[in-house]
């Protein structure tokens, strides 16, 4: 900000030397020797500085007080003063006015005991360190209006400078409240500290700002590692406070400065003036960390509490109010690790902080990208000091440095919502801001909650981050790349933009331990932009290591990728931020998807785990790439990257990659995390990877088993998507066992739909049966994005990677499958068998809410006893329509290959509802497996597989028309496959064999009677649908068959059959008619329904049809519209196209296109093109595209290949009349090409004009534009015979249209032009054309004659 803008009270004197106190207060240093400021700075000002001079601050405060809120630093030491503003007064600062007088008043009011202030814990004698929250003016207003004064007081804290001891506090300085819309163009804050000078300013709108542009962040790195001398400068003596508030207009160099300020020794105040969101910066000196500590906390645990401005402030009060404690550091008084405190000698300095979430793209994600930012070295001494008793809150200026500032800017309303979410916590748990953790914390954010409860006092509690933006406002997280790199000694490294130790007694004192943590939270104006939390607490090497990192990215309307890399250079027990928890760690509840890599090796091994959360809204795709590598370990653990893809109605999309590695001895102790509340499971798409070390027997990470205690040590990851009954179809799980040793894997997935939680497998069943046995099981389903409430399908990958074993398949059972049983309860068990077996087989399909027309509507959402069959693959037969059967035979051959065989009983239309599938595989015999399933007829099909490669099916009356085979490793994408039998090698069962010629229909009677049209036709003699002939050819084909086309009688299903059995007529029924038809089909018996309309053929259900209509309204992609038109019968399509759409699923296909990056890019391009093309603003997307192609074609070089390509495309587009009106506007250009182009160019132009001449209206336009003369010129030029023939065809079309006598009668608007058309020249031209035609014919005959 320029000096001019700075108000008198806010201006800092540039002339002050670095040695002086804060520039604002420097000049009045002699004048205000005693400046009293409450330890808790309740400056509620929304970012406006008092217009009064610093000296004019609320009055001199005793030297003992921290600092004057007015912006003047007092030289006094920071000591806790029981002064706090009254709850009501604290809040009432007028955002725009905030004068020194009011501050002084507030200061007086603050004389009230600290207990009154929500920031000060009543119990703690020492006042928690003052936090300076810079709240936007508007937010303050909002808060004052909407938030109880008590609650909002914390939010309104003006960035006030820390106590003298804290020496220079970096504080964001804003000259005056700035309206939300106004960017802080002029305000830049540069904090000149010695070497560590960092300045940060955030222009919300300004990309140049350091934090906003991600690129700029590089130099800044939020965590700038500072040399010890820098640290000293930071912990500079209070006399030397060099707190420069340099007001300058936004300059790049300043932007490059680090975005945070830290008090050298004292709590650093960070008030960021981020304008748009409430920006709460909170600083905590390590002793004062507990400023946020809940007032109700007896122990005065030092817990950092962050609260966000706006509603957040109240959030703090609210959650705490509930508990009676603002933010309670749940840890006992004895355990006094300051959450954020970093103790350190003067030389040691922790720099931490960071962030602004500027705009959606925000800097923080950007800054995160830089590796250096977060690094900060912290000596062990500091770590120990962290754990110092809270009672010793007296400032240790030299030793301690403020370590991080946590800044969250959010919009007021988003904060409020977030806070309300917080309130979901259990009564006894305090919620602090969006972020908090507490020892017995049971609270979970309604959107996201992580509960960490230490089992014992000595255990530290993992940090808990609650923050979900506005439920829907939070979209995809901005791209954040965070890399934590220890920069200090190997043994002592603190990495993290934000670090805290929850439990005081967390043995941070161990010398070899380092704590890394980074927490980033950024929020955009309208929604949380992103949040990253990294919390590490590390007990001594002897104790369990706990690392927590939580990454959360949420961004408004932007697709972002989050990538976190955590690498540990320290060979000692270093823990990396990405979040994870150690074995002994109390179970943590994660409300969100984690991508976790756990490596619990020797105690000195670092545990690296990234946890990313991508929260996506409104069909935003968030891709999370989590990579963690430890350098002391030979093999880096890379957690799988997953992208969360979300459909518009999906609330969240999240991906989960989970990779646990545990020591053999601790494998069973693996921590289990779950979130209790179903609402906490927004994941829609997960990918789970479980890697076991050579020695570990079991790994037991459970993700989100909300109802189930973590009673088992069985490796299991629970994945399910439960968000509003919407499940992403991308769910997938992959489990890799690099070791041959026996492990127990149990991956459970269940959908959390509505209020019910479905447990796919029984936990008890997944117990290891023998030491040598390996049980691998995971349930997965890929549900179509958000279409069906529960997970409908299971796509499961269990990959076993021993050298001798190979598993292939999107779905398959692990290396030694002894048996798989399909039980209606939805449980199955796989018992390991031969090690060397190779099980190959895959089957994949996507499900729709209602799959299949007729009997096959499958909705795996509802899990009634009679419906859901969970087996190696899950088919839930929906209500009346029972799935005929799912059969899986996993048969290891002698050489170790098991081939799954799926048998689907015959025609669905005649399927009996009584089918139960049993799949048995006996690896011991290796010789045969019997698969039984209820066939559509009374008879049963018995499939015997001799050594897995022999399959014969026998049916009575050939119930299965044709077998469908696929290899085990091949995926089939049919939603509801037709009768299927998979045989390994038997040629006689192969679909390649032609049907017996004797079975071919010999007449139309046989065809129409024996093969009634049905909703599906597959192998064997195809049903009638595959044969589609034009109406004009029907009689011709009838004569060829020796009969007349036979009409099909109207069936009892109230649906008339098509006139010609081989004819496909698109149905142009209205939406209302289609709805009625689909309802009638659902109400009818599936066996009796027979209809070959396009909706029935594509198996579109009522719900799917409604969703299709919504997608057409919300999307403008021309390709998606074409697919929708085909599905609605408005466009004809080839059989291949219809089969493809049916097999893929209409909604699944459209959703895939909507989420496919190139599709989105194309759609964006076309939308931009429309905006940039005012000449045709009323055209739809495809018409706009046609216009663009025409214009580009004329711009290309004459006769060039690009021009020919454009002409060819336009010719194809004009085969239908839809785009004639668009193309005809460019006739002049086409005539030019007709005269100037070569023979090939003229050929393509003439073909285009031939298409136009087939339309009456276009024929009229051709005549008006005098196209006849152009054609005659070509006659005279003696063009090629091909071109002459096309011209003659055009004349023939024109002649036919003229004879219809409707040519000039249709359009009354152009009567004048009609009158202008003179038919005499046309008649002469036609006669001349006729002469040319005769001559051409004669020439052709001469060539043919010998």
From Swiss-Prot:
The modification Phosphothreonine is found at residue 860. The modification Phosphoserine is found at residues 295, 619, 626, 862. Pfam families: Arm_2 (PF04826). Residues 211-226, 316-333 have a biased composition (Basic residues). It comes from the Eukaryota. InterPro entries: ARM-rpt_dom, ARM-type_fold, GASP1-3. GO terms for cellular component: cytosol; nucleus. Residues 461-484 have a biased composition (Polar residues). GO terms for biological process: endosome to lysosome transport; G protein-coupled receptor catabolic process. Keywords: Cytoplasm, Phosphoprotein. Residues 21-36 have a biased composition (Low complexity). The keyword NADP does not apply. It is found in: Cytoplasm. Expressed in the brain. Residues 347-361, 370-399, 990-1003 have a biased composition (Basic and acidic residues). Modulates lysosomal sorting and functional down-regulation of a variety of G-protein coupled receptors. Targets receptors for degradation in lysosomes via its interaction with BECN2. Interacts with cytoplasmic tails of a variety of G-protein coupled receptors such as delta opioid receptor/OPRD1, beta-2 adrenergic receptor/ADRB2 and D4 dopamine receptor/DRD4. Interacts with BECN2; the interaction is direct and with D2 dopamine receptor/DRD2. Interacts with PER1. Belongs to the GPRASP family. This is G-protein coupled receptor-associated sorting protein 1.
């Amino acid at each position: 900000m320029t000096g001019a803008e700075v108000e008198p009270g806010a201006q800092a004197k540039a002339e002050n030397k670095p040695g002086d106190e804060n520039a604002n207060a420097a000049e009045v240093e002699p004048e205000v020797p005693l400046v009293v400021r409450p330890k808790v700075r309740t400056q509620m000002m929304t970012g406006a500085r008092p217009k009064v001079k610093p000296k004019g601050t609320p009055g001199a405060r005793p030297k003992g007080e921290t600092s004057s809120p007015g912006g003047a630093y007092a030289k006094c030491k920071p000591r806790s003063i029981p002064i706090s503003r009254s709850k009501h007064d604290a809040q009432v600062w007028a955002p725009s006015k905030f004068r020194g007088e009011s501050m002084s008043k507030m200061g007086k009011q603050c004389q009230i005991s600290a207990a009154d202030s929500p920031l000060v814990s009543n119990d703690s004698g020492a006042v928690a360190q003052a936090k300076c929250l810079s709240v936007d003016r508007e937010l303050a207003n909002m808060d004052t209006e909407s938030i109880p004064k008590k609650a909002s007081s914390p939010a309104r804290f003006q960035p006030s400078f820390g106590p003298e001891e804290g020496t220079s506090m970096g504080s964001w300085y804003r000259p005056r409240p700035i309206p939300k819309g106004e960017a802080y163009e002029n305000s830049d804050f540069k904090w000149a500290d010695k070497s560590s000078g960092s300045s940060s300013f955030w222009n919300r709108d300004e990309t140049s700002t350091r934090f906003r542009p991600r690129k700029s962040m590089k130099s800044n790195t939020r965590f700038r590692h500072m040399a010890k001398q820098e640290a000293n400068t930071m912990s500079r003596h209070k006399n030397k406070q060099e707190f420069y508030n340099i007001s300058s207009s936004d300059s790049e160099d300043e932007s490059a400065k680090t975005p945070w300020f830290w008090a050298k020794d004292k709590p650093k105040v960070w008030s960021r003036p981020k304008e748009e969101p409430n920006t709460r910066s909170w600083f905590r000196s390590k002793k004062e960390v507990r400023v946020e500590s809940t007032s109700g906390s007896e122990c005065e645990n030092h817990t950092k509490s962050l609260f966000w401005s706006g509603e957040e402030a109240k959030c703090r009060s609210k959650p705490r109010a509930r508990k009676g404690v603002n933010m309670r550091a749940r840890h006992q008084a004895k355990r006094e690790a300051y959450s954020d405190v970093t103790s350190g000698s003067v030389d040691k300095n922790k720099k931490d902080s960071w962030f602004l979430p500027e705009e959606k793209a925000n800097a923080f994600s950007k800054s995160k990208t830089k590796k250096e930012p977060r690094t900060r070295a912290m000596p062990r001494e500091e770590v120990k000091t962290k754990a110092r008793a809270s009672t010793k809150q007296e400032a240790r200026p030299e030793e301690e440095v403020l370590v991080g500032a946590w800044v969250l800017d959010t919009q007021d309303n988003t904060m409020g919502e977030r806070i309300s979410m917080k309130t979901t916590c259990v009564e006894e748990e305090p919620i602090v801001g969006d972020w908090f953790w507490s020892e017995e914390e049971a609270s979970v954010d309604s959107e996201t909650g992580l509960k960490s409860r230490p089992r014992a006092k000595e255990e530290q509690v993992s940090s808990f981050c609650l923050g979900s933006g506005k439920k829907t406002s939070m979209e995809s997280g901005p791209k954040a790349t965070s890399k934590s790199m220890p920069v200090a000694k190997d043994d002592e490294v603190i990495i993290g933009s934000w670090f805290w130790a929850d439990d005081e007694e967390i043995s941070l004192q161990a010398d070899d331990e380092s704590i890394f943590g980074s927490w980033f939270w950024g929020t955009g104006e309208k929604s949380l932009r992103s949040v990253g939390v990294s919390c590490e607490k590390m007990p001594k090497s002897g104790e369990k290591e706990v690392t927590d990192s939580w990454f959360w990215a949420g961004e408004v309307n932007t697709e972002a990728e989050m990538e976190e890399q955590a690498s540990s250079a320290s060979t000692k027990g270093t823990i990396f931020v990405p979040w994870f928890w150690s074995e002994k760690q109390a179970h943590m509840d994660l409300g969100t998807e984690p991508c976790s890599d756990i490596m619990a090796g020797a105690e000195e091994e670092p545990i690296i785990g990234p946890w990313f959360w991508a929260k996506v809204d409104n069909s935003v795709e968030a891709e999370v790439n989590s990579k963690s590598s430890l350098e002391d370990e030979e093999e880096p653990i890379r957690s799988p990257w997953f992208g969360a893809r979300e459909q518009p109605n999906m609330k969240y999309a999240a991906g989960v990659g989970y990779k646990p590695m545990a020591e053999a001895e601790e494998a069973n102790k693996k921590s289990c995390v779950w979130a209790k509340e179903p609402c906490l499971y927004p994941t829609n798409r997960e990918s789970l990877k479980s890697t076991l070390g050579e020695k570990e027997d079991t790994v037991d990470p459970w993700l989100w088993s909300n109802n189930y205690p973590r009673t088992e040590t069985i490796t299991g990851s629970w994945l399910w998507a439960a968000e509003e009954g919407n499940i992403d179809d991308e769910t997938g799980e992959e489990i890799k066992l690099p070791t041959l040793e026996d492990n127990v894997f149990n991956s459970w997935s269940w959908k959390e739909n509505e209020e019910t939680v479905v447990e796919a497998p029984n936990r008890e069943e997944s117990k290891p049966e023998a030491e040598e046995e390996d049980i691998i099981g995971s349930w997965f389903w890929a549900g179509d994005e958000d279409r069906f409430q529960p997970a409908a399908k299971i796509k499961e990958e269990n990959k076993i990677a021993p050298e001798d074993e190979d598993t292939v398949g999107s779905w398959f059972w692990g290396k030694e499958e002894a048996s798989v049983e399909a039980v209606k309860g939805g449980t199955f068990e796989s018992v390991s068998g031969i090690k060397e077996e190779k099980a190959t087989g895959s089957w994949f399909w996507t499900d729709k809410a209602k799959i299949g027309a007729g009997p096959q509507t499958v909705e795996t959402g509802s899990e009634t006893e009679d419906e859901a069959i969970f087996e190696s693959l899950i088919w839930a037969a929906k209500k009346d329509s029972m799935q005929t059967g799912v059969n899986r035979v996993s048969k290891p051959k002698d050489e170790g290959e098991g081939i799954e065989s799926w048998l689907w009983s015959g025609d669905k239309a005649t399927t009996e509802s009584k089918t139960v599938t049993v799949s048995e595989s006996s690896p011991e015999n290796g010789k045969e497996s019997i698969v039984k399933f209820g066939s559509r007829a009374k008879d049963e099909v018995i499939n015997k597989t001799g050594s897995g490669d022999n399959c014969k099916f026998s049916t009575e009356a050939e119930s299965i028309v044709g077998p469908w085979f696929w290899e085990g490793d091949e995926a089939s994408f049919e939603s509801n496959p037709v009768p299927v039998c998979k045989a390994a090698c038997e040629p006689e069962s192969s679909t390649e064999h032609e049907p017996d010629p004797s079975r071919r229909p010999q007449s139309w009677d046989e065809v129409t009677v024996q093969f009634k049209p049905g909703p599906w036709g597959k192998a064997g003699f195809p049903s009638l649908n595959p044969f589609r002939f034009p109406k004009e050819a029907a009689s011709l084909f009838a004569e060829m068959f020796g009969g007349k086309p036979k009409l099909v009688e109207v069936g009892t299903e109230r649906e008339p059959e098509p006139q010609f059995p081989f004819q496909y007529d698109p149905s142009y029924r209205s939406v209302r008619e289609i709805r009625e038809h689909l309802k009638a089909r659902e109400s009818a018996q599936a066996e009796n329904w027979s209809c070959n309309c396009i909706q029935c053929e594509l198996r579109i259900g009522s719900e799917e049809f409604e969703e299709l209509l919504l997608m057409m309204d919300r999307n403008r992609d021309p390709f998606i519209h074409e697919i929708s038109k085909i599905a609605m019968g408005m466009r004809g399509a080839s059989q291949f196209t219809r089969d493809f759409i049916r097999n893929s699923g209409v909604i699944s296909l459209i959703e895939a296109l909507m989420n496919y990056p190139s599709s989105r890019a194309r759609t964006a391009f076309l939308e931009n093109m429309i905006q940039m093309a005012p000449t045709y603003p009323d055209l739809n997307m495809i018409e706009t595209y046609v216009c663009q192609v025409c214009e580009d074609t004329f711009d290309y070089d004459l006769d060039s290949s690009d021009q020919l390509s454009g002409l060819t495309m336009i010719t194809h587009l004009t085969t239908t009349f839809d785009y004639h009106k668009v193309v005809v506007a460019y006739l002049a250009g086409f005539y030019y090409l007709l005269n100037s182009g070569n023979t090939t160019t003229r050929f393509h132009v003439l073909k285009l004009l031939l298409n136009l001449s087939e339309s009456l209206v276009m024929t009229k336009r051709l005549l008006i534009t005098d196209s006849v003369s152009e054609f005659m010129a070509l006659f005279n030029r003696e063009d090629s015979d091909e071109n002459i023939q096309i011209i003659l065809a055009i004349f023939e079309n024109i002649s036919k249209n003229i004879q219809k006598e409707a040519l000039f009668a249709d359009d009354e608007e152009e009567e004048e032009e009609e009158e202008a058309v003179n038919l005499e020249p046309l008649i002469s031209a036609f006669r001349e054309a006729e002469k040319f035609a005769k001559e051409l014919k004669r020439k052709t005959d001469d060539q043919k004659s010998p």
